[in-house]
Amino acid sequence: SLTATGVIQILADYAQGLIEKGKSAAEVAERTDIFKTRVHAIAMVDTLEFLQKGGRISKTAAMIGELARLKPLITLTEEGGVGVIGKAIGKNKAMSFMLKWLEEHPVDDAWPKYSIYTCGTENCEQFEEKLKNHGIETMGRLQIGAAIGTHIGPNAFGIIYVEKA
């Protein structure tokens, strides 16, 4: 998945910097392992249909959630899985939740930030505008790969970034 690739790119850049400073392989591995806890990928799921089709939620939960315009907010966990960090009613409240998350887990501007999306960039573009209004500029846009995209469906969007230490 390109999302994972974005996270891996940040980790590789960090490790490369340590190597250039003459750190040992063991120290590079140890420090990178600690650093990876600061790298986050958060996203909003636009539809519950694909979570239901993938067996992640029941048909009833999907139907009720869709009627309520429920938008799950997810992140990659330290174990490499996907975890729910919150839920919002509607896309705008989901974006507000994500911006609040970024305030509580502040962005380290020394590292690149990437906006992420499944298919369809409209939501991602709106989120990038809100990020910009909050002083957060992304370096580029990465499409979420099929491994995750098939489970979260179209029009999902988010950000990959490094949290301040």
Segments the model singles out, each with a brief description of its role:
Residues 2-165:
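Mixed-charge interfacial surface used for oligomerization/domain docking
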